């Protein structure tokens, strides 16, 4: 899944102006597995992979994702998700923070599973420790399925944060 998503972002960057887009304003968002993929995109080495500027993504929101895949390999999921050591390393955003060139919002709800909460807190702490801009948002009273709904409202927990990150928030 990561490879086609990366190719898509590279394509959007190269073609955005053809359909009225601005390649200098690419932001990514994902929740759950999409939160993991947003993290992968934000920590991609765009120069090495696509010969593009390192900072093609200007910001992102990673909501309720997995950012270190080692625990996935140790869980019951290992019966149907098989990773090699190399895949685990390559697909763990937390291990590639040297390629993070944009502010990031990491979010989760207080009613989510402890592992989603831990992964989000650990990822945000690692980003901060790397000296990169990060905002950790905790959605009080939201579960894994409800928190994403706040993105669709400009005053919701996620909606407000994303609009501010994109400098589109109304004063």
Outline where the language-model segments fall.
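Alpha/beta-hydrolase superfamily serine-hydrolase fold, recognizing
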Residues: 1-171
């Amino acid at each position: 899944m990561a490879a086609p998503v990366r190719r898509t972002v590279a394509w959007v960057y190269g073609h955005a102006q053809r359909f009225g887009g601005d390649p200098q304003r690419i932001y990514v968002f994902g929740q759950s597995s999409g939160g993991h993929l947003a993290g992968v995109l934000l920590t991609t080495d765009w120069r090495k992979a696509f010969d593009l500027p390192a900072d093609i993504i200007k910001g992102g929101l990673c909501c309720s994702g997995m950012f270190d895949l080692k625990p996935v390999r140790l869980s019951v999921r290992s019966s149907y998700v098989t990773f090699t050591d190399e895949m685990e390393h390559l697909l763990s955003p937390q291990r590639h923070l040297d390629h993070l060139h944009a502010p990031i919002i990491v979010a989760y709800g207080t009613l989510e599973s402890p592992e989603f909460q831990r992964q989000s807190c650990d990822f945000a702490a690692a980003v901060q420790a790397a000296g990169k801009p990060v905002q950790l948002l905790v959605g009080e009273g939201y579960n894994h399925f409800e928190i994403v709904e706040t993105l669709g409202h400009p005053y919701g927990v996620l909606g407000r944060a994303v609009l501010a990150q994109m400098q589109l928030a109304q004063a």
